[in-house]
């Protein structure tokens, strides 16, 4: 049964401490502080129940991320106009919600949570479990660069023999078609071009985007409509995104420290 970091004690949010008895901030039912010598201190519903189906069992990854934010932002009860209630992992005073996802999730639940929390929401996903299935490949230019509108980049083919992280970075191994390559009758020629023909344009217009191959992808993160950031465990994190007019699935390098600082400063997520 999922545990809680926060319960209400005499109507005020409180962390667990020995001997305390409080109330669940979502449903108002009794909550008991669990403060043993082995597990971290936490709150639990009295009896075998939990009132929020979106909460998951938490491990070290989940707790470490929560601890980066002020206690007042952690496990905040949220309500919508219809009376539906859920507990956001992290919610800033300005309404920005940060959901920390460790376990697999259905597309239906993802869509429900995005609809509930609205557009000001960030998914931070523990991607260490499927890190070996993602190959980060060649760099892409800024999708907003003028010359990119003419290009149709070719997505690499998944190969289980090369499912490790390979970051090249200069664009030379890219392959693409040009929309402007047409026959006199207007039909596309489908002439394939090499990234070498772009010279230094990729390096000069690089803002973190990379092609990637994802073996056995978790489709839920390809279909999410809010910001999704994969945590592989290091300083570099990766935004899961769609590139250009063709919406080619790719990843974008994100600085973990800059992302966290922007969220703490009350700003939009720094990417």
Role assignments for model-derived ranges:
Residues 1-19, 129-271:
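Non-catalytic C-terminal interaction segments of nucleic acid-processing enzymes
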Residues 1-74, 80, 255-271:
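Nuclease-adjacent, charged terminal/linker segments that flank catalytic cores
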Residues 15-18, 28-34, 61-112, 129-141:
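Active-site metal-binding core of divalent-cation-utilizing nuclease and nuclease-like domains
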Residues 120-125:
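Short hydrophobic alpha-helical runs that function as membrane-insertion/retention elements
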